[in-house]
């Protein structure tokens, strides 16, 4: 079954609802494009020799790229229920992501707060997990979600 958590309206979401997305592999081309686009030329992302001398022994993927890909995995492009991204809290990168790692998103509703007649703020546990089951990016995503039209 495809990921549908953020296709639901505010009233249909329940604390504890959880889903896992499809996976995607992060390639060297992804890292090069991201670093070029953003200007993030930090040596651990771009310099193989420097990275081999580092704590990680090889190049790592920029954390912001991992977070950006999590939105691509977890936010449906045609969603009519998401009114706005309200923010991200408690962002952490507890383990490195390496080139050629395959990641997926594990999302769960942790809290709902009524806002107004149009909808409410939903807080989701937003964890990116690699092919080994290791969480590489953990955060709380806050989304303004529409109420049902009925």
Where are these regions (language model features)?
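HotDog/MaoC-like acyl-thioester-processing domains
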Residues: 1-15, 93, 97-102, 106-150
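Short beta-strand or tight-loop elements
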Residues: 84, 89, 105
